[in-house]
Amino acid sequence: MRGDCGRLVPFASGSCFSLANSTSPSLERKITEFHGQPKFIINEVHKIAGEGEFNLKAVAKKLKANKNNEWTPLEGDGDFRSDECESLLKQSDIVVTNPPFSLFREYVKQLFDYNKKFVIISNKNTITCKEIFPLIKANRLWVGATSFNKDLLFISPEKVEPANKPKSATRTVDGVVFLRSPSIWVTNLDHGRRHQPLPLMTMKENLKYSKHKEIKGKRKYDKYVNYDAIEVPFTDAIPSDHDGEMGVPISFLDKYNPDQFEIVGISLAMAKPMSAIAQKGTYVQGGPRFYIAHGDGTYKRLYDRIVIKSRRAKS
């Protein structure tokens, strides 16, 4: 967090950071709500001298040291559905939190019901849910400035022993063991990276120069057998001159520019049943997914795909 009150960052897992009356130059009232802990009401934020970086513990220490701020106990247990917490939510302009993933869809609905701006943590796969994806498609929710190719790190709770976790589930930074989570930030606050155009090659250039063996040297891109679109297995392999529909991995969303592409839909809702196309035993069965032909009478089932279309086709 930089030394000015214009840039604020969220607290750790399990907390809810809500900003109220943030149009004031001093951000006069902000409310932080902790599940099962006191609510921390920040009435005043001073500028921090210097241009150095501060970690969250240092920021929290300075906020607590300000006598104009106060700790007050919650009457309940901090459940976001309680009248008490909804009252705090109504006062806020921006909510920053790590909501319970098991109640994520209900939590997001509450934020939209109250027309709140937010920056929240989401499991990467949650964005394919039928309640969440339509919000992404309608440009009402999008991925923050985080990468699908990286996991978020969380400080390990005292009751959790990192040594009992698989090595792949932890990461040590400067001697501190963090727990890894396949999560991303999602938000309805616009940000500059969201409007940076993807630099892309044409289809011909991709087939000749792509760094991916799945693309380079082929005569053409694969087409799905159960939906009319081409398969683009990598975001950087999207052909800049293709005007039709394309299926891309969900990791495309951290590079999605709504000025450059239109989101048409998702394979979960658009894939035609393979039972109407191919004989049983020639493909792996499962929920709605796109399939491509192997060329030997069998078919490959793909991971979830987002269907997009270039906006150049409309210009």
Feature roles, as predicted:
Residues 1-96, 100-315:
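Class I S-adenosyl-L-methionine-dependent methyltransferase catalytic core
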